[in-house]
Amino acid sequence: MIRSYIRNIILAILSPLLTTPPPLILPPPYEKIIQEITTVLSINNYDDGSLAPIILRLAWHCCATYDMTTNTGGSNGATMRFVPEITDEGNYGLDIARAALEPIKQRYPAISYADLWTLAGKVAIEYMGGPTIIWKSGRVDYTNDRCTPSNGLLPFADKDANHIRKTFTRLGYNDQQTVALIGAHGVGRCHKRFSGWEGKWTRTPKTFSNQFYVVLLNETWSQGEVPETGKTQYFNADKSLIMLNTDMELIRDKSYLHWVEIYAKDEPKFFHDFSSAFAKLLELGIKRETL
């Protein structure tokens, strides 16, 4: 009986030492991940030699499904991996951006797709000379499609100012923030194989600047069609630059025009307002666990 008592005491002392501790989960090495994102942005065989604009578009679109009335959608969950979001016509071509980032995800599995895609958007903007974007980690990846938003939530580029305002109001933006966010059209280009539209908005599609507003105000625009697709867009005089109908609506609507004129004259103001609006975009719908 005494032996049993002593044995129980010894086991009580040793049992914490004999228990296998849970595996140590280290946070993702964000600085290394940022460095690796930067290395994939420059590429010779795509567009103007940069993936930064399309990676910015990936971050934008994975956030822009948010609905403030239901608090659904947004970047949390990385739902663009699932049907129907992956098939939304507004997301055509984004497989290029996702594929470019996939090796980074495989090397650093601790980072969620949702964090990786949004972080890559921040890095892309800064890489192109844009403002510093505040980014916070903590997004999770959903394991199934139950929370995947329906299609049709992204802005349609052939619509009018009412559509723009309705879409951005759903996201929680006012007119100023809306015009600031659309200024991202200053980088990248349209691809007829993805959207049916073709061409670039500015002469510096790899440089983040206020040129979208400058070009929108100062060029002479005429409506035309993309021959291969029949899609209507606007061309400048020498047809080297384009605008979409939603872009033109920014100078037809008085409230939007007010901010277009301000940003065309004041790039630091645009950078400040864009940085704030984009950081807000990245946070839409995020629910972080607190300890």
Curated annotation (Swiss-Prot):
Q: Which SUPFAM superfamilies match?
A: Heme-dependent peroxidases
GO BP annotations of the record are: cellular response to oxidative stress; hydrogen peroxide catabolic process; response to reactive oxygen species
Lineage, top-rank taxon, reads Eukaryota
First-level EC class:
oxidoreductase
Pfam families from the UniProt entry: peroxidase
Q: Which Gene3D superfamilies match?
A: 1.10.520.10, Peroxidase, domain 2 (1.10.420.10)
The residues that hold heme b are: 185
For this protein, the record's PROSITE patterns field holds:
PEROXIDASE_2 (PS00436), PEROXIDASE_4 (PS50873)
**Matching InterPro entries, A to Z?**
Ccp1-like, Haem_peroxidase, Haem_peroxidase_sf, Peroxidase_I, Peroxidases_AS
The entry's family comment says: Belongs to the peroxidase family. Cytochrome c peroxidase subfamily.
Recorded protein name is Putative heme-binding peroxidase
Q: Which organism is it from?
A: Candida albicans (strain SC5314 / ATCC MYA-2876) (Yeast)
